[in-house]
Regions:
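Residue-level signal for short segments within beta-strands and strand-turn junctions
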Residues: 9, 18, 45-48
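Short, mixed-charge low-complexity intrinsically disordered segments
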Residues: 34-80
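Intrinsic low-complexity, intrinsically disordered segments enriched in polar/basic residues
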Residues: 1-2, 31, 53
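Structural boundary micro-motifs
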Residues: 3, 17-18, 27-29, 69-80
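Short aromatic-glycine-(Arg/Gly/Cys) micro-motifs in beta-strand/loop hairpins
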Residues: 1-13
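Surface-exposed loop/edge segments in extracytoplasmic proteins
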Residues: 13-17, 56-58
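Intrinsic disorder/low-complexity segments in short proteins, especially the signal peptide
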Residues: 12, 28-31, 61
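A short, charged, amphipathic alpha-helix used as a generic interaction element across diverse proteins
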Residues: 18-42
Length: 80
C-alpha cells in the first residue's frame, strides 16, 4: 500500500511523523492499523485528496493544530 504513515502519541500531546516509512516498522509500534480509543499509540494512513488536504485512513480530516471537537474528541496536529 502506497502512502504516508504516521505514528502519533496523543497522550503526551506530541506527534511524530514518519514519512514513507515501512509499514512493518509501524506495525510493531501500534496494536491496530487505525485510531485506537484507549491505546497509547495510534497509527494512521495519510493520503492526500484532490484538494491537497490530508486525511486519515478512516477519512477523517487531519488538522494542523490541536482542537477540541464538539463531542470532546481531540484532533491531532499533523503537518506533512
Amino acid at each position: 500500500m502506497k502512502g504516508k504513515y504516521c505514528l502519533i502519541d496523543i497522550y503526551e500531546n506530541t506527534y511524530v511523523i514518519a514519512k514513507d516509512i515501512a509499514l512493518n516498522t509501524l506495525k510493531a509500534k501500534a496494536k491496530e492499523y487505525h485510531w485506537e480509543t484507549d491505546g497509547e499509540c495510534m497509527l494512521a494512513y495519510i493520503k492526500a485528496d484532490t484538494n491537497g488536504k490530508y486525511h486519515l485512513r478512516d477519512r477523517q480530516p487531519v488538522y494542523t493544530s490541536w482542537d477540541e471537537t464538539e463531542n470532546g474528541n481531540t484532533t491531532v496536529c499533523v503537518e506533512l
